From Swiss-Prot:
Subcellular location: Nucleus, Nucleolus
Biased composition (Acidic residues): 63-75, 121-131, 140-158
Protein name: U3 small nucleolar RNA-associated protein 25
Gene Ontology molecular-function annotations: rRNA binding; U3 snoRNA binding
Pfam family, one: UTP25_NTPase-like
Region spans: Disordered: 1-158
Similarity section: Belongs to the UTP25 family.
Amino acid sequence: MQESGACRKKPAMPSRNAGSHLVVMKRIQRNGDGAMKRQKHGRRELREVKRTSRRSAKSEDFSGAEDENNGENETEVAVNNSESGEQEGVDDTGMAYNALLTLLGSEKPEKPTKRRKNDEAGVEEINEDDLEIHLTKSDDESDEENEPEVASDDEESDEKFNAFDFHFNQPSEDYMEKASQSVTSKWNNTTKETIDEYVVSTSTPSCMNKESVKLGISSIKKRVRDVYSEKHPSKISGIDASLLDSMLNYKSVLYPYKHYNNTFYRELYSMHAINHVFKTRDNILKNTEKIKHAQEMALEGKSHEDKEYRDQGFTRPKVLILLPTRNAAYEVVENILKYSGSEQQENKKKFKAQFNSNDVPPETKPQDFRDAFKGNNNDFFCLGMKFTRKSAKLYSSFYSSDIIIASPLGLSMILENPDKKKRQYDFLSSIEVFIVDRATQIEAQNWAHVNLVLKYLNKVPKEFHDADFSRIRMWYINDQAPLVRQTLVFCEYTTPPITSLVSSKSVNIGGRVRYKPIYTSKNCIMNSIGLRLKQIFQRFSSSSPMEDSENRFKFFINSMLPSLLSSTSYSDGILVYIPSYFDYVRIKNYMRNSTKFTFEGIDEYSTQSKLTRYRQQFISGKVKILLYTERLHYFRRFEINGVKTLLMYGVPSNPLFYKELVRCIGKSVFKEVADIDLSFVKVMYSQWDAIALERIVGGDRAPVLCSGTNEMYEFR
């Protein structure tokens, strides 16, 4: 935000022990004696699992038009709601998630809370410490009674190859057993092709003996395809066609979209997500009709084949989408609702009030910053979306949802509730499409939350949740769901943690596709700085990525620091940019205890008063050296004044940061505080920084810097 604090709203800087606020309604239904009313299950006698044989078609849980109350008296939480009509007691097996946190026991009296009225939404903000969780079973659905078994107007057309059936229904137990061994050991050679400005690399496990068929818009459900065709009449081509084909073939994908203005990929994965939900639902309804017909034949005494139809998971949710902010979630939900073609959209007004905002960062900030932090940048949310033939419901309970949209922070607070008895993760047991969008923003928040979500993804549930085991796919029962889970990762640029989501943490038998942007000396960020400034790249030796941090620190304290003042023409105005916060703390402690440098450090946890004071002292020369973290620059985008020499402890992950920091020297030159012939930039790097270097110097220069005979390279 602006240094003067003139911005209406600061982007949240989530700490690693983030305490957050939730938006909730205080309208909670209670009975006469003040106790919380318990919600009924509706058709409970048909939903409880009392045997493992096939149940009748009427107990099917994927359904049609809903007969629910509209949520006027619901407890509204940004996570989810349980909706029901009449209320009655239920036992513990009927408990399902209806809120984010359990921090107070239900037997404790309600504590007074501080309230902040939101006039537009009619809601109140309550600190999470005062939030009481209410675990109830999913809403009283009567969908199966009103839903036609097969939507005849929604059949696929021009589809010669059913990728959904091939990926989820056809794999046998023997095949999955072989696949579980091959995906962790041997993959076929990667094939590469160049499309537009990307190198597309495709890898498949050795067990995959069938080449994928090129798929396009024609293989998508008609109701989804019609919406797309109306909005995008021109034919999809190039990298977009390749990306859609990879999604529809259920391959795992890593796609750097390079620029914040590129948003079309979100249209594609939103369309893919709702298409998967509809195909799953129609597959179940068709099989239910077959089972019903077989039962009728049996009652008439006619012979029939007792065939199994395994088409379900342990729980209903099939798509999980992780996003960094509520504004990002708002945009994706709008896309999904658009492609669903739903005539009715429940709780849309509440959703808009809690997720949408017109706040924008000041125009003095870079465009990518303004895009990342526009609107509601709250990073604490979870939302369930449920779809029927004609309606869409927001804030559905997790166990009755088809799609779950959440921030990693919001979801992690559910998965690892402080009260172990009340932790919930069963709703993630049957996720088949896992999407991480704006991964670079999420990494800047706290990547540990993403790793936590992966820990619980496709984990065998603790409870049955009224599952019909005669319909559950065998690879779910055999704990092989990760083998078919599709992982889609979208980022502005790649980093090792982001890349690992597809390269090592995805074992999808459908294969994986990596899209790598082509950077050259002409389109790299260095070529766009517009400042003829000496830029020195200093390589240090590092034998492995695991030892890189230690080798970097030793090189810095043994080679860089001792010659820091002697190698520069200025004794002040030295800015040290440090990508890692942990390296920053280590360097700060070393310089304070083992050197006599006059320095200060500012980071993402510094108070506003310290940020202002140290930057002013740096300008005046009272502070000779200023340590500056990458995460602080991400959240604040300061234009540091008084910079005469720039030392980068590591290569910036975001190439735009390199350009912005170098221009800090340009600003000093313009103000005649520094001489362009005396100032310089020095970057420490190792061979393991090759990918980040490509974005700065270009793909043709990076290999030379990493493996050349010289250890120092200079550019102007």
